[in-house]
Swiss-Prot record:
CDD domains: IPMI (cd01583). This is 3-isopropylmalate dehydratase large subunit. Keywords: 4Fe-4S, Amino-acid biosynthesis, Branched-chain amino acid biosynthesis, Iron, Iron-sulfur, Leucine biosynthesis, Lyase, Metal-binding. GO terms for molecular function: 3-isopropylmalate dehydratase activity; 4 iron, 4 sulfur cluster binding; metal ion binding. InterPro entries: 3-IsopropMal_deHydase_lsu (IPR004430), Acnase/IPM_dHydase_lsu_aba_1/3 (IPR015931), Acoase/IPM_deHydtase_lsu_aba (IPR001030), Aconitase_4Fe-4S_BS (IPR018136), Aconitase_4Fe-4S_dom (IPR036008), IPM_dehydratase_rel_enz (IPR050067), IPMI_cat (IPR033941). Pathway: Amino-acid biosynthesis; L-leucine biosynthesis; L-leucine from 3-methyl-2-oxobutanoate: step 2/4. Heterodimer of LeuC and LeuD. It catalyses: (2R,3S)-3-isopropylmalate = (2S)-2-isopropylmalate. GO terms for biological process: L-leucine biosynthetic process. Catalyzes the isomerization between 2-isopropylmalate and 3-isopropylmalate, via the formation of 2-isopropylmaleate. The keyword Disulfide bond does not apply. Its cofactor is [4Fe-4S] cluster.
Length: 464
């Protein structure tokens, strides 16, 4: 019987197996940020250890930094974490993309764009959404602080091999429907625990037609379905994306040949298989307090099925049977490691070009990295956003999470391109609705959600 992509990635990195069936995996790339690393570095000091492979480690500042005045860090804990990362990287000789550096950005945006992320690698980071890098045919997953220390010290990690889930996507997406809608559909249909104990492999004709940045969105949110990771077999689009990037291999042809071996054999069997036809998918909007609480834009909110639904409706200030079009939007956030890349900003800009943000709506665009920001500005996207009434910010995690100055006030609703809508995720009492960049941009113009499949809404929006 053939092997799955997961099998090939896993087997090539097993150093040894212990009596409990745990495998010691070699880690090819360790990404680090300011929030989950301080205790790990301190652990090295206390045990008089060094970073085993600083050349396979890369750090950036993203979670805590302000995106408006990046050097004006008023929060004491945030400043301490940023200063500590700077000191730790200097002491342990770990490369750091500091504030203002041309390589700085959200950790899961800069990894791919710098060419650090490559097919066949094992990649870890002290962050849940490390699965993003799986879009390149890498086995990438988030780890805890104690594991961060273990990888820093040994460049290895004890792991139990997960099962393999195949998610086959077929059909062509309608205009106005995106990868974000696919993953929100998957979660709404199968729930936040469907992937527990599995690595999700996305494949099929829909995947083949997707560009790399859409694939990253899919893999980014595999963790929201409980999966260990999300992966996609590398192809010509993958190779073309990596080629020529700063940290990509110089002997590219040799590596491309090796990378081409990472795919699921035709006679391999998944432990679980899910088939989704995307042809009739609509834009999705989450209404509740986890990413599976979502509906199509043309559906009404569901009835209360259990105590969790009741709590979610109460927290969100919504009612069963309410129209998605009637959900008020006071804030719009276009950013995060899910949807802050150049193509995401281009889609959002195409929606708002020549239009105005509705009075009373606060709208932010936060590029995922310095390089994304510069590329967007070269295309004039910043002018489109600013003329429409958006705030054009510096890169960072921003409003994705309530760990920096960009937060949603209590009781107010935010159309967000991020990945989590938990209670308090964007600030105390914040009400988060997960959507695609197009849906978020359109909501900024109307102050409520509209259907981005339509060419225009009351004649007010047209795509260029």
């Amino acid at each position: 019987m053939g092997k799955r992509l997961l099998d090939k990635l896993w087997e090539r990195h097993v150093v040894t197996t212990n009596e409990n069936g745990l495998d010691l995996l070699y880690i090819d790339l360790h990404l680090v940020h300011e929030v989950t690393s301080p205790q790990a570095f301190e652990g090295l000091r206390l045990t008089n250890r060094t970073v085993r492979r600083p050349d396979l480690t890369f750090a950036t500042m993203d979670h805590n930094i302000p995106t408006k005045d990046v050097w004006n860090i008023t929060d004491r804990i945030a400043k301490q974490q940023l200063d500590t990362l700077r000191e730790n990287c200097k002491q342990f000789q770990v490369p750091l993309a500091d504030i203002g550096d041309e390589e700085q950005g959200i950790v899961h945006v800069i990894g791919p764009e710098l060419g650090l992320t490559q097919p066949g690698k094992t990649i870890v980071c002290g962050d849940s959404h490390t699965a993003t890098h799986g879009a390149f045919g890498a086995l990438a997953f988030g780890i805890g602080t104690s594991e961060v220390e273990h990888v820093l010290a040994t460049q290895t990690l004890w792991q139990r091999k997960p099962k393999a889930m195949g998610i086959e996507l077929k059909g062509k997406l309608q205009k106005g429907v995106y990868a974000k809608d696919i993953i929100l559909h998957l979660l709404s249909k199968y729930g936040v625990a469907v992937g527990t104990g599995y690595v999700m492999e996305f494949y099929g004709e829909t995947i083949e037609s997707m560009e790399m940045e859409e694939r990253m969105t899919l893999c980014n949110m595999a963790i929201e379905g409980g999966a260990k990771a999300g992966i996609i077999a590398p192809d010509e689009k993958t190779f073309a994306y990596v080629k020529g990037r700063k940290y990509a291999p110089k002997d590219y042809e040799t590596f491309e040949k090796k990378w081409s071996e990472f795919y699921t054999d035709v006679d391999a069997m998944y432990d679980l298989h899910i088939l989704i036809d995307v042809t009739d998918l609509a834009p999705y909007v989450t209404w509740g307090t986890n990413p599976s609480m979502g509906v199509r834009i043309d559906e009404r909110l569901p009835e209360k099925n259990d105590v969790n639904d009741e709590r979610a409706f109460s927290y969100m200030g919504l009612s069963p049977g309410q129209s998605t079009y009637d959900i008020p939007v006071q804030h719009v956030f276009i950013g995060s490691c899910t949807n802050s890349r150049l193509s995401d900003l281009e889609i959002a800009a195409s929606v708002v070009k020549g239009k105005k943000v509705k009075e009373g709506v606060r709208a932010l665009v936060v590029p995922g990295s310095k390089r994304v920001r510069e590329a967007a500005m070269q295309k004039g996207l910043h002018r489109i956003f600013e003329e429409a009434g958006f705030e054009w910010r510096e890169p960072g995690c921003s409003m994705c999470l309530g760990m920096n100055p960009d937060q949603v006030p209590e009781g107010e609703h935010c159309a967000s391109t991020s990945n989590r809508n938990f209670e308090g995720r964007q600030g105390k009492g914040a009400r988060t609705h997960l959507v695609s960049p197009a849906m978020a941009a359109a909501a900024a113009l109307y102050g409520h959600f509209v259907d981005t499949r339509k060419e225009s809404y009351d004649g007010a929006i047209s795509y260029s």
